[in-house]
Amino acid sequence: MEKVKIIGGGLAGSEAAWQLAKRKIPVEIYEMRPIVTTPVHKTEYLAELVCSNSFKSTEITNASGLLKEEMRKLDSLLLRVAEETRVPAGVALAVDRELFSKRVQEILLESPYVTVIREEVKKLPKEGIVIVATGPLTSSDFAEHLMEVLDTDSLYFYDAVSPIIYADSINYEKVFSASRYGKGEETYLNCPMTKEEYERFVEELINAETVESHYPGEEKFFEGCLPIEVLAKRGIDTLRYGPMKPIGLIDPKTGKEPYAVVQLRPENIQKTLYSMVGFQTRLKFQEQRRIFRMIPGLENAEFARYGVMHRNTYFYAPKFLKATLQFIKDERVFFAGQLIGVEGYMESAAMGIVAGINAARLYKGKPLIILPPTTMIGALISYVTTKVPVRYYQPMNANWGILLPLDKPIKDKKLRNRLLAERALRDLEDVIRRFAINV
């Protein structure tokens, strides 16, 4: 029988392999470790966790919890193993990292349908169904090949992501809508600062705690995109002549330009999420929460995701992927994991589940599935396959802001999240039933 080839044995690749093997489809997982090593991997196990050992919340009223519940309904291997290897962490799902990866590998190797081949793949196979899940540390040779297959401008080698804020946590009495010099639509929200507010803000940025790099030599990737806290250290006025410049923005309350301004740009059509323009940062998450809440209008800001800057190979997926996670130019090829622009362990694994299910359905000549954007997995896929200007595309994690809003707005956040979760699971179960996905 022809075998499906999976390039990369990380979280996404392991989930994809499981979905294929349980449907009795032969799989070859190509994993370059330990033949070719990376700066952060410590073992040769599949699904190795290189950073945190936490998979975040299990509560259904949390976006991460909903994502995991959807994955559970799609028979996630990683969640099953996570429960087996769980360590105490309150409502979060944390694991013994070595036991977790070891057990995932054991289960996959126990399957008569799975073969693991320890070698580096440098080019896409020209025949057969292929799932590419090489992750944030894609080898240089394969990355170079991807640049030829995609195009040079669509492959990125680091994240420089500004924080994203839930729209309903912004104090609209303190911000104003305007575009610079009144040109174009007033799509930006502007948070004005006085001289005193600005100088206190800069002082806190200068003294804030930052994240240490996981990857040797990582800093060289950021020379063309400096963190906000590094800019602050270059001089008291650097930020207000850079990303916080007020030029051409008139505060309607004063009729004048503010001393400095923080701009917020809508992240989606529904305007449920706003990103902080030019605020790429390496501040620790608790520092981002503390310092960015000093900004007028953001005193009670809730963060859909925090700013990050780290090594991460990913590409501009909307140009190349269908909602089935197939490559538009060659539909026998699927892409999954962080490579397509999702951020996080479970988010990457969820993409592997969908790629695995659809690869299996393609193999058997069945119609492929597209999960609705009312589900968290479907919303993530919608995010990475919906075209936006390239300069605005950045990796995304599970959060409530990417889901389609409810038909009727609800102010109570807990109630709204519960109703969103109930709708997501109901819609997912409908797809599972209609397509007989778990059969």
UniProtKB/Swiss-Prot annotation:
Keyword tRNA-binding: no
SUPFAM superfamilies: FAD/NAD(P)-binding domain
Molecular function GO labels: flavin adenine dinucleotide binding; tRNA (uracil(54)-C5)-methyltransferase activity, 5,10-methylenetetrahydrofolate-dependent
Subcellular location: Cytoplasm
Primary location class: cytoplasm
One Pfam family per UniProt: GIDA
Enzymatic reactions: uridine(54) in tRNA + (6R)-5,10-methylene-5,6,7,8-tetrahydrofolate + NADH + H(+) = 5-methyluridine(54) in tRNA + (6S)-5,6,7,8-tetrahydrofolate + NAD(+); uridine(54) in tRNA + (6R)-5,10-methylene-5,6,7,8-tetrahydrofolate + NADPH + H(+) = 5-methyluridine(54) in tRNA + (6S)-5,6,7,8-tetrahydrofolate + NADP(+)
Any one annotated GO CC term: cytosol
EC number: 2.1.1.74
Top-level taxon of the source organism: Bacteria
Record-linked InterPro entries: FAD/NAD-bd_sf (IPR036188), MnmG-rel (IPR002218), MnmG-rel_CS (IPR020595), MnmG_N (IPR040131), TrmFO (IPR004417)
Cleavable signal peptide: none
Tagged with keyword tRNA processing: yes
Co-factor(s): FAD
Transmembrane segments: none
Keywords linked to the UniProt accession: Cytoplasm, FAD, Flavoprotein, Methyltransferase, NAD, NADP, Transferase, tRNA processing
Binding, FAD: 8-13
Cited function: Catalyzes the folate-dependent formation of 5-methyl-uridine at position 54 (M-5-U54) in all tRNAs.
Annotated PANTHER family: GLUCOSE INHIBITED DIVISION PROTEIN A, METHYLENETETRAHYDROFOLATE--TRNA-(URACIL-5-)-METHYLTRANSFERASE TRMFO
Family to which this protein belongs: Belongs to the MnmG family. TrmFO subfamily.
Protein known as: Methylenetetrahydrofolate--tRNA-(uracil-5-)-methyltransferase TrmFO
Gene this protein is translated from: trmFO
